[in-house]
Amino acid sequence: MGSAQNERIPSLTRWYIDTRQLTVTNPSLPLLEALQPSDQEAVKRFYHLRDRHMSLASNLLKYLFIHRSCCIPWNKISISRTPDPHRRPCFIPSPALTEATDEPIPGIEFNVSHQASLVALAGTIIPQSHGASPNPTTVFANPSPSSVPAPSVPQVGIDITCVDERHARTSSAPSTRDQLAGYVDIFAEVFSSRELDTIKNLGGRFPADAQDGEAVEYGLRLFYTYWALKEAYIKMTGEALLAPWLRELEFTDVIAPEPAPAPGQGSAENWGEPYTGVKIWLYGKRVEDVRIEVVAFETGYIFATAARGAGLGAESRPLSRDAGVAVSVDRWMHMEKIDIDRDIAPCATGVCQCTKKQP
């Protein structure tokens, strides 16, 4: 696995861990002892093994990103949180760590999500050319839905939804258009009237009287796509689902990503084709500076990523492949699968070369 970033060119790292097989085969908590005691206790507070594994994977991803991005020893890492009420995980180097480090420790921005045994992280290094790195507690003290604290400050959000999880846990998943409409209406405080109508109407993809399973299934995928988009955006700002402007944030031109093809049928490690055509509106005005995309993983998962600031927003979209036009390098890295034994264990146990100075 390559380094997290090229520090001179901000890029968006995106990693994920799939804990499903771990939960089936391993009742233990690998590398738990490599976390700080408070993080170990947080993992063990979960009752179900799969929830423990997701919490563990979330911590391991955060530690790995901090370790690789900031080039500090694993055992010196500690996770901080932004002020109440949001309590967003962040990294604030302690004065002792800063004094003991020869090189300046770069500021970083990251966000994590977990759902149905999958855990994902999106993160970036704050460019050092912009002077002193801002303190995350300051950046997210007063979250703004419409703008970054400063153009040089990146903000990222990521979210995972699972279309199949409701089917697996209950027998009450909607099976008709009327049931779908009733289910969607439960979330009237989250979605705008236009978004609710679009979901109920299946985005105009099916006839108004279509009642078959395919139509309802698409409606559920569309609902979870909207949910992932909204979560990714508000997490990018540092807010939560309690944000008072939730219904004023609207997404249009939304298409539920098709389930990813089976392995060997053109898919890249079970990933579908990212959809980037979503338009964002806030208080009725078009949001132009945010880049957002959704992509399907396997048949049941939908990932959404949002970013703005420091060249990672809308301006970071790669150029088209029109004849005679060079294709720019995409600053958004593809989703990369992280293996606990292969990728994390060497760093967590101190045998990696991440903190060694290059000759």
UniProtKB/Swiss-Prot annotation:
The keyword Transferase applies. The keyword Transit peptide does not apply. GO terms for biological process: 1,8-dihydroxynaphthalene-melanin biosynthetic process; fumagillin biosynthetic process; fumigaclavine C biosynthetic process; fumiquinazoline C biosynthetic process; gliotoxin biosynthetic process; lysine biosynthetic process; lysine biosynthetic process via aminoadipic acid; N',N'',N'''-triacetylfusarinine C biosynthetic process. Keywords: Transferase, Virulence. Activity is inhibited bythe antifunfal copmpounds PD 404,182, 6-nitroso-1,2-benzopyrone, and calmidazolium chloride with IC(50) values of 3.9 uM, 35.2 uM, and 19.2 uM, respectively. It catalyses: apo-[ACP] + CoA = holo-[ACP] + adenosine 3',5'-bisphosphate + H(+). Acyl-carrier-protein synthase that transfers the 4'-phosphopantetheine moiety from coenzyme A to a Ser of an acyl-carrier-protein. The 4'-phosphopantetheine (4'-PPT) portion of CoA provides the essential prosthetic group for a number of carrier proteins and multi-domain enzymes, priming them for the acceptance of acyl building blocks in fatty acid synthesis and many aspects of secondary metabolism mediated by polyketide synthases (PKSs) and non-ribosomal peptide synthetases (NRPSs). Belongs to the P-Pant transferase superfamily. This is 4'-phosphopantetheinyl transferase A.
